[in-house]
Amino acid sequence: MVIVYGIQLNIIKHLFEIERKPRKGLLAVEWVIMGYLLLTALMVLFTFTKAVNPEAMLWGRFRIVLLTVAMWLVYRLIPCRFTLLCRITVQMLLLPWWYPDTYELNRILPNLDHHFAAYEQWLFGCQPALLFSQAITHPVFSEMMHMGYASYFPLIALVALFYFFFRYNEFNRTMFIILTSFFIYYLIFIFLPVTGPQYYYLAAGVDNIANGVFPNVHDFFATHDKPLTMPGYSDGFFYQCVASAHATGERPTAAFPSSHVGITTILMFLAWRSRSRLLFWGIMPLYVLMCLATVYIQAHYAIDVIGGWVSAVVIYIVLHFLCGKICPIKK
């Protein structure tokens, strides 16, 4: 008990110990977010007459700027590990706000799902997202798939907190890679309006999809955001977790490449780089389930998964290189 108590005190001491060389300005990742914010704000202004909620989008961005500045001031007043963690945590908690925002920006563009579904058919000779859940219907398998999908944000938090507590010198650059990756994907989603099977199959007609017919739905999703009923064991705990998350934040956007697969692949790279076998192999099963689940629950085409893998490799290599320039390891 004495040893445990001593460890707890040591952790608390490190959390609130004033840093000798506190960071003076915004973090690199905060600059990235401000850049994304400015770029998308300009897009809202240029498409103001076509956008559905332009005032709310601009006001939301203004509040994010104020919140970012406020967290910077808190850190400057008390420059310690805890306030730095708070700065990062705030930006992480804002991701669910940024995600549906991509739909508000890309809904004015013509939908491209018919091209992706047709390419999927050419590549695989079928629609894996349509057949996967039909082929394996057992409740246990369904729950495994939904557990994998529901593990998305817990996996991000796990890797982030591991670096914070055990690799603090690399925490800043790790969060730069994770958060910047998100905003790279968001930028892609804005200019590549693909909704994925859960939306396109309903709009095009499941019978058409089963017969290999993929009609162009044009701007259908500009005014429609209803998805198919998610396949799987609907009474399952993890099924309900995913269903609840989709009900609150899902939109017909962000299908290609799969950011779920892309981000978790980047997490695997970071877990490997952490030199912790326990972390890497501990999250590996959930990573595999994630890659399968995106197709099983019809959130993505199979080619979206492939796109997630390829994009993750490219993004990680580029950001890892940039880290050496703008996020040096803090000694």
Q: Across the structure, where does each feature detected by a protein language model lie?
A:
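Hydrophobic alpha-helical transmembrane segments
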Residues: R63-L67, G148-A160, A255-L267
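N-terminal transmembrane-helix/juxtamembrane module of multi-pass inner/ER membrane proteins
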Residues: I3-I64, F82-C86, V90-I156
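Hydrophobic cores of alpha-helical transmembrane segments in multi-pass inner/ER membrane proteins
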Residues: I3-L9, I64-R76, P154-V159, A312-V314, ...
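Aromatic-anchored segments of alpha-helical transmembrane domains
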Residues: L37-L45, L94-P100, F182-I190, P285-Y296
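Membrane-embedded catalytic cores of phosphoryl/pyrophosphoryl-handling enzymes
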Residues: L27, D235-K331
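Membrane-interfacial catalytic/cofactor-binding modules of polytopic membrane enzymes
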Residues: F191-R273
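Interfacial segments of alpha-helical transmembrane regions
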Residues: L85-V90, L158-P193, Q198-G212, I283
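Membrane-interface helix-boundary motifs at transmembrane edges
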Residues: R20-K24, V52-E55, Y75-R87, Y163-T174, ...
